[in-house]
């Protein structure tokens, strides 16, 4: 990655959607561009900025002279944490209220003696209000869709699913009567997909459903961007990226971002130390993993937004216990809907010699640890990519959004996962864990995951497809005048 040669640094303003899974890859890309010579302003919501300071310490977001944090309001009541867990509310509020404070921030930055003028914007694919600001200020904007390419294609096709009468559902019975098994064979670049494999916001009977219409609007507005960035790589999703390229502005597949990010030299440790976690990390789990045999531990983490019932928590607990496998299980605050997650005391007693529970962890490092043999996951895109980079096979339990699409591809196209299909029952979970860790199917998936790991490393190595895509999006878009 050659640094930018310029008398005055280019200044990129980054705007992630205010959720953990969106902030993480956005921060990795921001740090990479800073390493390449960009001045960075990273814009969190006021609410999330405060949460990060609480989880990481009061100086965590002091930044560096060339990497600054700023905030804008999200339009919701300042102290209402529940409102931030209501995704439709957050999407509706940010899309309607954030433009004016964002433009005011850009004006402030442009007149600040402490930073060069803003030269480009890198914004989340679902923060398209920023496009109006880019147009107003006459600067290029790249949209970073933090989804898989197959997930993005699912969203891009929402308007056709509506046109064809496939969504909204005609009747609540359609959720469970086999309707979701309807084959969808007309989406360019996608094969062997069903209605149930589309991003989950189609699962509504409400013709005015906020998320359905929000995603139609955001994908349509994406056409105004100077370019689109995806955190994927050509070998993994070439067919669907090619199809997307006929529907959207130029697409640059620059992932998995964690690989070039990990290559930033140690003299930039101040930059690498800038964190993005909304929860405090437990790093003790890495020491615990050091005591375990290679490929012996099941890692369990359902991400930052999944919610389950207490009954499901209990069934997962006993499924893990009965498998007799060592496990590291991340149970974040809020995992169980409306109550504190409490695993059965008998489960704790039964597994005390082989299990570890924590509330959050440095997942990338965990998935790169030699002790990890399998990953029970919600199949968010970051988790899927991080597993690929570690060569770790998956048991998939999707919660919402494009996780359903990621699962379909993980299990049928990429050969790295098995899906929990149906109700969460302890015997079923026990059987899947044993299959993953000891069975022939698990061995095949591990072999496939290691093949993808090597292809990901090839893509991000010098002259690899993702390496060149990142160089090109910098030189052709971010350092060029707006068309």
From Swiss-Prot:
UniProt catalytic activity: (R)-mandelonitrile + UDP-alpha-D-glucose = (R)-prunasin + UDP + H(+)
Annotated EC: 2.4.1.354
Disulfide bond entries: none
GO MF, any single term: quercetin 3-O-glucosyltransferase activity
Binding-site positions, an anthocyanidin: 22, 401
Record's keyword terms, sorted: Glycosyltransferase, Transferase
CDD domains assigned to the protein according to its UniProt record, in alphabetical order: GT1_Gtf-like
Keyword Transferase set for record: yes
Stored InterPro entries: UDP_glucos_trans (IPR002213), UDP_glycos_trans_CS (IPR035595)
Keyword Repeat applies: no
Enzyme class: transferase
Positions annotated to bind UDP-alpha-D-glucose: 146, 363, 378, 381-383, 386, 402-403
Active-site residue numbers: 22, 124
Similarity comment: Belongs to the UDP-glycosyltransferase family.
Function of the protein: Involved in the biosynthesis of the cyanogenic glycoside (R)-prunasin, a precursor of (R)-amygdalin, which at high concentrations is associated with intense bitterness in kernels of almond. Stereo-selectively glucosylates (R)-mandelonitrile to produce (R)-prunasin.
Name the UniProt record assigns to this protein: (R)-mandelonitrile beta-glucosyltransferase
Gene: UGT85A19
